[in-house]
């Protein structure tokens, strides 16, 4: 019999308590704070959690407050910047997610003006801005792929593919990659901006670009071009893997550097493994899936010390670990992934038992302090989403983080 993830009665009670606490805190934040409207750290991300909390237990959520703030989000769309993190790409993703959650009342015209706005604003050849997902071009892919479930997004995805093609570095052996732009805020080496720098994180690097391109293989007019990009990029990415089997990490944070990286969504082996597995399954490349499984299983042996886990959030915290192993097990069912998910859930709930609500605080590496964070990526909202997913195995929201 396959190994199963399980929660004890006491753990279920603890999660129920946590969800009540988190819902109350996020509801207070939504009601009283002057929040930016973004998905990753603002109102949209907190509304996403409240929606899932309502599905879990409707009594936890003030429906009138949710409706009021969702209306405010929609009314403020014309005042937003465009990027995923705080801008329109993330907010519009949420609106499409909620639109699709009610199939009988789905409104196909709700976001057509946003489609056109993005098509026009992103159509620059060659692309000159950021290429990663938080502030850059790859961050428009979650919206485009979510919209493509219900409408033809050939034009919008075509613009995204054009931009990423225009910035790609191609090698004679067929490998393809992307160097961080010279003016990128995410460059590690800002002193030598003309030197190529190949970031290996899902949030800011090549794995994220691969994940952003992947849904476009479902679009007939783009399939051939996108397949070429994906195969060249995955082959390049696998060449960056360490040959040192004693290292904690298979990949570093940047190509050519030391093979040391944390466990997390943002950087590290886990989301590289996830991305390779998804491409391998989509393009029928079993070798990618095999390598992904090896990388994921290697990472499953790491704990909070070797994984540099210092807080709770989705980005690189212990609740984020539970969700990532949950997704890996959905992609590549394996007892070791179930065990790793169990480990991080047990660890997370034990932290709450020992430290209370402060165990949920976000760690700020600049001032070396823990603080409350109400947001999706680093704070309460994301932790709450992770907890609801433990009960129903529904990770249908993770496409906004390029994990589906």
Label the model's feature ranges:
Residues 1-21, 152, 159, 215, ...:
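Terminal, non-catalytic domain-edge segments
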Residues 93-166:
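Internal, well-ordered domain-core segments that constitute the primary functional module
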């Amino acid at each position: 019999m396959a190994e199963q993830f399980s929660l004890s009665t006491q753990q279920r009670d603890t999660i129920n308590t946590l969800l009540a606490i988190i819902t109350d805190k996020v509801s207070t934040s939504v009601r009283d704070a002057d929040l930016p409207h973004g998905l990753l750290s603002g109102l949209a991300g907190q509304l996403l959690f409240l929606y899932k909390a309502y599905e879990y237990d409707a009594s936890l959520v003030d429906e009138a407050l949710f409706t009021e703030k969702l209306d405010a989000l929609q009314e403020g769309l014309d005042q937003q910047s465009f990027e995923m993190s705080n801008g329109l790409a993330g907010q519009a993703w949420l609106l499409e997610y909620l639109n699709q959650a009610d199939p009988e009342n789905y409104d196909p015209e709700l976001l057509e003006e946003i489609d056109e706005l993005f098509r026009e604003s992103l159509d620059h050849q060659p692309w000159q801005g950021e290429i990663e997902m938080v502030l850059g071009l790859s961050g428009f892919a979650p919206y485009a792929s979510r919209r493509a479930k219900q409408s033809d997004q050939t034009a919008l995805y075509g613009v995204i593919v054009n931009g990423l093609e225009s910035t790609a570095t191609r090698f004679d052996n067929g490998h393809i990659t992307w160097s961080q732009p010279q003016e990128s805020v995410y460059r590690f080496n800002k002193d030598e901006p003309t030197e190529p720098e190949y970031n290996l994180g899902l949030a800011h690097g090549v794995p994220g670009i691969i994940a952003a391109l992947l849904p476009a293989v479902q679009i007939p007019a783009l399939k051939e071009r996108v397949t070429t990009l994906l195969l060249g990029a995955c082959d390049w990415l696998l060449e960056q893997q360490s040959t040192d089997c004693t290292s904690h990490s298979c990949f570093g944070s940047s190509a050519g550097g030391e093979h040391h990286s944390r466990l997390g969504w943002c950087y590290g082996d886990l989301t590289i493994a996830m991305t390779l597995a998804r491409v391998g399954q989509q393009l029928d490349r079993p070798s990618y899936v095999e390598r992904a499984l090896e990388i994921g299983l290697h990472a499953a042996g790491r704990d909070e010390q070797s994984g540099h886990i210092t807080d709770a959030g989705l980005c690189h915290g212990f609740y984020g670990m539970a969700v990532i192993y949950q997704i890996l097990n959905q992609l590549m069912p394996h007892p070791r992934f179930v065990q790793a998910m169990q480990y991080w859930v047990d660890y997370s709930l034990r932290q709450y038992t020992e430290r209370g609500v402060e165990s949920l605080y976000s760690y700020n590496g600049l001032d070396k302090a823990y603080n409350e964070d109400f947001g999706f990526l680093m704070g309460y909202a994301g932790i709450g989403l992770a907890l609801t997913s433990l009960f129903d195995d529904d990770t249908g929201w993770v496409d906004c983080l390029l994990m589906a």
